[in-house]
């Protein structure tokens, strides 16, 4: 598969209200993302969470990065101030979350090291409809169903949908960290790139097969065209760049 660069303006993407199983209002802008790498599925989005949005304490069967842009992301064990980054690995509990103020940020989700296939939000919505049709119910982030024998099922809503789409019984992978990792970029110095003049980096962390960094370019600095073996996402948070003969503003 030929790998091409996809570049978009956040302002041009439709804001879609979330109609999932969590409490409170949330909305997002999903960026078009095709890695060009077979089997590598990522979901990257701009997110808004309103006052009153909440989730119970839970864990994922995928890895997730969050970069908080404005406000405070009010999550126990993963609290993010504006400008901070969090890594929420598969199998690691965190939360609950209850927003006492609105916040915005970026979210990136992808398959973790366990190899459990990543289920997209479109697939999750499909699963939710199917599970409701089968007699289940979603409330406060929990999926509940009464089995024919009278047994009551209570599981995390996301896990229930993922298991449904997988078509098999799943178990959470063992967490490789005690809790989510919060990265504070203000405590990281800018390090000059060894090869590129006017380019600096803050390498915040490397976690298994993924990593995250900030890059800063001085006026006139250039990053030459190159081909990567792995998928890479860049989001402009300040200033402007030129790419493909067009100027892009943050």
Predicted regions and their residues:
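Jelly-roll (double-stranded beta-helix
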Residues: 1-67, 72-250
């Amino acid at each position: 598969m030929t790998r091409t660069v996809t570049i978009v303006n956040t302002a041009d993407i439709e804001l879609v209200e979330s109609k999932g199983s969590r409490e409170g209002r949330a909305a997002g802008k999903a960026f078009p993302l095709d890695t060009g790498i077979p089997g590598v599925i990522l979901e990257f989005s701009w997110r808004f969470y309103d006052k009153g949005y909440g989730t119970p304490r839970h864990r994922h069967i995928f890895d997730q990065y969050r970069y908080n842009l404005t406000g405070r992301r009010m999550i126990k064990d993963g609290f993010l101030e504006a400008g901070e980054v969090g890594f929420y690995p598969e199998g690691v509990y965190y939360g609950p979350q209850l927003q006492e103020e609105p916040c915005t940020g970026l979210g990136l989700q992808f398959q973790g090291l366990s190899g459990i296939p990543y289920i997209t939000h479109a697939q999750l919505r499909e699963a939710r409809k199917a599970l409701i049709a089968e007699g289940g119910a979603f409330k406060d982030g929990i999926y509940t169903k009464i089995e024919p024998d009278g047994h009551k099922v209570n599981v995390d809503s996301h896990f229930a949908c993922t298991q449904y789409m997988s078509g098999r019984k799943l178990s959470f992978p063992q967490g490789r960290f005690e809790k989510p990792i919060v990265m504070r970029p203000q405590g990281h110095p800018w390090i000059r790139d060894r090869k590129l003049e006017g380019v600096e980096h803050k390498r915040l962390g490397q976690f298994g097969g993924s990593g995250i960094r900030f890059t800063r370019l001085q006026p006139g600095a250039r990053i030459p065209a190159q081909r990567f073996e792995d998928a890479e996402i860049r989001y402009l948070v300040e200033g402007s760049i030129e790419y493909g003969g067009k100027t892009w503003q943050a």
